[in-house]
Amino acid sequence: MSRLPVRPLAGALIGALVIVMTSMLGTATATAVPVAATRSAVAIELDTDLTLLVAKCEGCVITLLSYDGANPVYSSVPATVTGGSVTINLPSARTAGMSVRVEPPWLTTRVAADTNVVWRYAGKAIGDSIGFREARSKRRASGCWAGTVNEAVTLTIKVRQVSYRGRPGAIAWAPVTESFVPPMERVRDGVLVSDDVLACDLYR
C-alpha cells in the first residue's frame, strides 16, 4: 500500500472522514496509511494501538506525546521496547501531531534534552527511504506525525548511539519517510532534541 502525503482539512470534512473510515476499517491490523486525525475523533472515542518496531534498541523507553498549542499536552505511560517492539494504546485524536520521545539505556546520566523520532527530514518526500549516513547529514526535520484513525498501526523507527555535543546521545528516525505536520525544526547532525514537548502545527 503506498503512502500518501497528508494535509490538514476543513473541520467538517475531517469529521465526515473520521466517521466513514471508522465504519470501513473495522479491526484493521496491517500497517496503515497515516491519515490526518483531529480532535473531532474524541466525539466517537476512537483508540489506536500504535506498534513501533525498534531494532537494536532493547530496553529503550518510549513515550508518545501530543501538543498542538491549543489543547492540553497528552503523554502516554512510558513503555519499554521488548523483543524489538513496543505497543502503546492512545486516543486516535491525539495521534495527529504526535511525537515520540526515546530514552535509550546507554544514557546512564540525566540529559538536558530528550531525543525525538524524526518522521521527515528536509528534502525527503513521503515514502522515501533514508539511511543512517544520510540522516546524519541533515539540518532540518519534523518530529510531528500526521496521525491516523485506524484501530491499529505499525511503524518502523531506527535508533542509533551517537555523540551529541561531545556526550553520549542518540539519533532516532523513520527509515521510510512518514506523513508529517509542521514545523521543520533545526537539527544537529540529524538529531532532533527538545527540552519540552514538541509543539506541532495542525492548523497551517
Question: Which stretches of residues belong to each language-model region?
Answer:
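Beta-strand-rich domain onsets/edges
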Residues: 33-48, 198-204
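Short, acidic Ser/Thr/Gly-rich low-complexity loop/linker segments typical of extracellular
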Residues: 70-87
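Secretory targeting and sorting signals
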Residues: 1-36
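Short, surface-exposed beta-strand/strand-loop-strand elements in extracellular ectodomains
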Residues: 62-70
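Short Pro-Gly-centered beta-turn/loop motif in secreted/extracellular proteins
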Residues: 83-129
